[in-house]
């Protein structure tokens, strides 16, 4: 039996990060955590491109364009959708998650879901660097692992 898994080595990987500007008090912290995770695992800052979009709903389109370019080993999507008093939360959350998954499957490039979908601002703050760690950092590690796993599969 052969076993395959990705490593967390970021050397020579080219990564894109798509960040929503909406709820920037959260997404800025997710981006900081993500960049910290990448730098701690030897990703050269010259190999990281950051793209800003207005809101989470716009993330899948930009991720698709980047994935189609075949320039990146992985793409990290960062955003924060926080429930309000209207059904808007459900629409945006559902479409963003479906859109990101579809891009990854269609383009065969890992697109990591680092979009927080929280009921409250406090939950989002907790996941952006306080009690629950930083989900941006976690997304960075997922991107490294998946990028390396995809390389291993291609080489086997």
From Swiss-Prot:
Binding sites annotated in the UniProt record for 5-amino-6-(D-ribitylamino)uracil: 22, 56-58, 80-82, 113
Record bears the keyword Transferase: yes
Pathway in which this enzyme or protein is active: Cofactor biosynthesis; riboflavin biosynthesis; riboflavin from 2-hydroxy-3-oxobutyl phosphate and 5-amino-6-(D-ribitylamino)uracil: step 1/2
Enzyme nomenclature, EC number: 2.5.1.78
GO biological process assignments: riboflavin biosynthetic process
Cellular component terms (Gene Ontology): cytosol; riboflavin synthase complex
Domain of life: Bacteria
Keyword annotations of the record: Riboflavin biosynthesis, Transferase
Active-site feature positions: 88
GO MF, one annotated term: 6,7-dimethyl-8-ribityllumazine synthase activity
Record's keyword annotation contains Cytoplasm: no
Catalytic activity: (2S)-2-hydroxy-3-oxobutyl phosphate + 5-amino-6-(D-ribitylamino)uracil = 6,7-dimethyl-8-(1-D-ribityl)lumazine + phosphate + 2 H2O + H(+)
Positions bound to (2S)-2-hydroxy-3-oxobutyl phosphate: 85-86, 127
Protein family (similarity comment): Belongs to the DMRL synthase family.
Record function comment: Catalyzes the formation of 6,7-dimethyl-8-ribityllumazine by condensation of 5-amino-6-(D-ribitylamino)uracil with 3,4-dihydroxy-2-butanone 4-phosphate. This is the penultimate step in the biosynthesis of riboflavin.
The protein, known as: 6,7-dimethyl-8-ribityllumazine synthase
Species this chain originates from: Caldicellulosiruptor saccharolyticus (strain ATCC 43494 / DSM 8903 / Tp8T 6331)
Native organism taxonomy: Bacteria, Bacillati, Bacillota, Bacillota incertae sedis, Caldicellulosiruptorales
Gene: ribH
